[in-house]
């Protein structure tokens, strides 16, 4: 086992998705010493871990990028760009089209683009995992990291879990914490649709969540989120039913799956232990329970925590309860915003209400296609 000699970082960040990469960038720019551990490789074409995701950047996430003065390079954008969603209830066969303003993108390249903005002053371990961590008698966090084909020990004054739904930081700090979760299953197919599309599917016989299909760079991404029990069987039935609506889903090129959280009450959000460990993004439970959109909350929670840590002066243990309270207060608006999303759920996921909304045509677009 190797050890970073005589180095105690101000912050150790686990996970460099949108939340972790944003936090690492902001802290390093403001002069804090940062070490980060990420499962992804640094080269977009070298394989390795990729976050399963439909790859649509919602308006809230676009605003988060805009507020931070960031833009999207052409290499991140996917073809085509879509301006409406075809919404299908697989049980009733009712369809509507709604206008939407998502950016179609390559999620993996987006994540790596955010990582590339982290200043070189930060120490970043790519293609690496945290195997364990503890706090020593001086209040310093000790992380056991597997990186560069060996075990390393890393030391930091604060620890931030930005490692998503299956966060090792959250699981170890709060082993009894329970939050509603689902399995998202997604497959990629050769896109044989006659027209590019973004589609959204509902079928309350299989899930109280939703499914999606997105044309992306010559492929069709098709997926859905299910309660974890029998998710594979539910996905196959879901896919079969979608095929009846003209979708070509016979020969998947690859299959992905991941855990996804779905908060339903304030206690589902866990911000940290009050003693120098913090959680941001989906690791903290910050993901929309209606749309499963999490990128905006990831970047926004990271921005809040960056302000708190960088403005703290000395990161001493006696200050940690105060910093935790500041994070709780400043993130309250974010958490309340997430809880208001629950109010949308009956109109999206309760079959009778959804059928009434779709039948009424409220907010639906009239689509005329000339062949």
Name these PLM-found stretches.
Residues 14, 161-162, 279:
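Redox-cofactor binding/interface segments in oxidoreductases and associated redox assembly factors
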Residues 63-172, 178-182:
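Conserved N-terminal helical subregion
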Residues 165-239:
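Conserved FAD-binding catalytic core of PHBH/FMO-like flavoproteins
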Residues 12, 28-51:
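Glycine-rich FAD pyrophosphate-binding loop
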Residues 307-371:
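C-terminal helical "tail/cap" subdomain of flavin- and related membrane-associated enzymes
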Residues 23-32, 64:
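A short, Lys/Arg-enriched amphipathic alpha-helix followed by its capping loop at the start of a domain
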Residues 3-19:
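Beta1/beta-strand and adjacent pyrophosphate-binding region of the FAD-binding site
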Residues 132, 229-305:
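FAD/FMN-dependent oxidoreductases across multiple families
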């Amino acid at each position: 086992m190797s050890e970073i000699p005589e180095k105690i970082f101000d912050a150790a960040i686990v996970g460099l998705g949108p939340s972790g990469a944003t936090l690492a960038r902001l802290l390093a720019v403001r002069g804090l010493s940062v070490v980060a551990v990420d499962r992804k490789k640094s080269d977009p074409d070298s394989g390795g871990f990729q976050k399963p995701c439909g790859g649509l950047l919602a308006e809230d996430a676009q605003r988060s990028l805009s507020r931070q003065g960031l833009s999207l390079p052409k290499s991140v954008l996917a073809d085509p760009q879509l301006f409406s969603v075809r919404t299908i209830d697989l049980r009733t066969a009712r369809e509507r089209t709604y206008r939407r303003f998502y950016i179609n993108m390559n999620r993996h390249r987006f994540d790596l683009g955010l990582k590339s903005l982290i200043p070189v002053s930060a120490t970043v371990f790519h293609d690496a995992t945290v195997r364990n961590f503890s706090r020593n008698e001086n209040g310093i966090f000790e992380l056991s990291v597997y990186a560069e084909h060996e075990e390393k020990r890393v030391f930091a004054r604060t620890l931030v879990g930005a490692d998503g739904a299956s966060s090792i930081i959250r699981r170890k700090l709060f082993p009894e914490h329970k939050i509603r979760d689902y399995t998202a299953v997604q497959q990629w197919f050769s896109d044989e649709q006659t027209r590019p599309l973004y589609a959204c599917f509902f079928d309350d016989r299989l899930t109280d969540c939703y499914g999606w299909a997105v044309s992306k760079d010559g492929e069709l991404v098709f997926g859905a989120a299910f309660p974890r029990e029998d998710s594979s069987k539910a996905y196959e039935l879901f896919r079969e039913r979608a095929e009846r609506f003209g979708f070509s889903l016979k020969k998947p090129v690859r299959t992905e799956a991941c855990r996804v959280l779905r908060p339903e009450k304030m206690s589902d959000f866990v911000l940290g232990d009050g003693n120098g460990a913090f959680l941001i993004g989906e690791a903290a439970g910050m993901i929309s329970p209606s749309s499963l959109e999490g990128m905006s909350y990831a970047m926004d929670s990271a921005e809040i925590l960056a302000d708190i840590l960088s403005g703290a002066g000395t990161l001493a243990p006696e200050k940690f309860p105060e910093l935790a309270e500041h994070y709780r207060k400043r993130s309250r608006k974010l958490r309340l915003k997430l809880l208001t999303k629950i109010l949308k759920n009956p109109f999206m996921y309760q079959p009778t209400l959804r059928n009434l909304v779709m039948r009424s045509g409220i907010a639906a677009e009239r689509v005329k296609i000339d062949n």
